[in-house]
Amino acid sequence: MKFIVKLYPEIMIKSKPVRMRFTKMLESNIRNVLKKIDEDAKVQRQWDKIMVKVPKDKPELTELFAERLAHIPGIHHVLQVAEYDFETVDDIYQLALPVYRDMLKDKTFCVRVKRAGQHDFNSIEVERYVGGGLNQFTEAKGVQLKNPDVTIQLEIDRDKLYMVSQRIEGLGGFPIAAQEDVLSLISGGFDSGVASFQFIKKGSRTHYCFFNLGGAQHEIGVKQVAYHLWKTYGESHKVKFVSVPFEEVVTEILERIENGQMGVVLKRMMMRAATRVAERMGIQALVTGESLGQVSSQTLTNLNVIDRSTDLLILRPLISMDKPDIIREARRIGTEDFAASMPEYCGVISQRPTVKAVLSKVEAEEQKFSEDLLDRVLAKAEVIDIRDIAVATSERVTETETVSSAAGNEVIIDIRAPEEEESRPLDVDGVEVKVIPFFKLATAFAELDKDKTYLLYCERGVMSKLQALYLQEQGYNNVKVYRP
């Protein structure tokens, strides 16, 4: 069994040198992917297509090869074919008759032929000859050129005949490495996953940068998204996953920055950190999942202010997409379930965000940061080969106990941001309630009575769980999540 890989039309219209270069890249990418399935896979480049051969003694690999080819960027469609030698048009008919005789019983059909090479016949003559013979010597209802029950597809290349048994639609785009590398800021949500996919499809080797706002569970979830995107669509090339611990930055923002500027300042700090990561990796562009007007930091004014934090090009492929369209695309590429279960954070952004940030005012606020804040944060960044994530995703984060009521000997810790706690204070009869914002909990917890059990509370229950997981990782087992 063979596959004929058809190049994406945008590759076909390139100049001869560019087309040849892209075709070589695609051949190499296909080989890299299929060799991981079976070392005996054969991949051969031709001028207008790429031939892939399934090992004769391993027909069971046919379906797997087809599935992998459908997810490699740069492919328009794939034809699953059987190959035959022939000399005359009658040979073609004689080869087609036993293959299609039973298939055509009581059905209308037509024959479509594509031909390359020097022959004493043309494609239409083959269609007429083969179609006439099949109509006469099978139990078909007859020939029907428009909307037939069966379309017989034949491809002729010099002295080879290919009978098409299946057409598989490809991903489109350009082969990976056709464009320069990019660094995608990934959060695990709908937007960043789709944005990352768009650049994989466009031919960029897409690396991932994750800003960890607290908790192993969130990081493992984001790693799963990145690994899925790489394994499904970009496996032909090695990429990096960079995890930057950003809790310290969030703490300083919440303690020092004016409330309305917090969201824009956080994004600017992320861009600065990502820029330094990208420069170390020799990457000249960042990718984000921002969409115009989706949240307060994504107005034109605020995006302009955010862009001023870096000299690198910031690419936003989803800038004009609506959220339902983004979710549909996430569903199509397989990241929807990951994104739907990804944590949201309580109080990480401001309660009264500005939609028209003023650059001078934002820069003045940023002067309040510790001088070496980003240096300290980036010194703790973890850079791993994405292939190693498979090991990490097999690990299970300890399940944190969640309770709906508190006993008199337990202490509730309200970890909400100060604005939330002040506007909706928590009061539980007969139970002590301490107020420790989540961004101070890691250091403050060490000073608490170790003989007591502490129940962490936030309105959504996500940050409290992540903080409990973090404390458990530090060796504290007297922690639960409080969800009244």
Curated annotation (Swiss-Prot):
InterPro entries: Rhodanese-like_dom, Rhodanese-like_dom_sf, Rossmann-like_a/b/a_fold, ThiI_AANH, ThiI_fer, ThiI_N, THII_Thiazole_biosynth_dom, THUMP_dom
Pathway given in the UniProt record: Cofactor biosynthesis; thiamine diphosphate biosynthesis
Its EC number(s): 2.8.1.4
Pfam families the UniProt entry points to: Rhodanese, ThiI, ThiI_fer, THUMP
Catalytic residues, chain numbering: C458 (cysteine persulfide intermediate)
Limits of the Rhodanese domain: 406-484
UniProt domain THUMP: residue ranges: 63-167
NCBIfam families, per database record: ThiI_C_thiazole, tRNA uracil 4-sulfurtransferase ThiI
PANTHER family: TRNA SULFURTRANSFERASE
Record-stated family: Belongs to the ThiI family.
Primary role: Catalyzes the ATP-dependent transfer of a sulfur to tRNA to produce 4-thiouridine in position 8 of tRNAs, which functions as a near-UV photosensor. Also catalyzes the transfer of sulfur to the sulfur carrier protein ThiS, forming ThiS-thiocarboxylate. This is a step in the synthesis of thiazole, in the thiamine biosynthesis pathway. The sulfur is donated as persulfide by IscS.
Protein name: tRNA sulfurtransferase
Originating organism: Shewanella amazonensis (strain ATCC BAA-1098 / SB2B)
